[in-house]
Amino acid sequence: NINIECSSALDVDFNKSNLIISYYTIQFMHPSSRQYLFDKIYNSLEWGGGFIFFEKVRAPDARFQDIMTQVYNEFKVKQGYSAEEIMGKSKSLKGVMEPFSTQGNIDLAKRAGFSDIMSIFKNICFEGFLAIK
């Protein structure tokens, strides 16, 4: 059975599940709420169940973050976006989206109880993870 929810992830009453997917959602949650969500998801999964989550990620340091931002902005320009559109989007996300680093996301999963975690997708500053209970 598939259940699609449209509400705060913190308010969802997860049933026992074999698979839970989060697609670019957690990065918009307040950082102090994220561990609670990971814990809740882990506890809702059947043994051997998977949690797939995709997030925008920060680079491990400022130098690499500058490089990733530049590469991503160049990509957007090649896709036809104007400098004004790129800057407008960046400003609109300021204070609303707070991505963690790759390691920060892995650490959330580990603290929740996941021990088998791997990156399944990576493109510039976007990454997908699979965590298995």
Regions found by a protein language model. Name each.
Residues 21-22, 52:
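A conserved beta-strand element that flanks and buttresses the S-adenosyl-L-methionine
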Residues 24-28, 55:
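Short catalytic micro-motifs in class I SAM-dependent methyltransferases
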Residues 35-48:
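A short glycine-rich, Lys/Arg-flanked "PGG" loop and its adjoining helix->strand segment in the class I
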Residues 10-20:
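A short acidic, Gly/Pro-enriched loop at the edge of an enzyme's catalytic core
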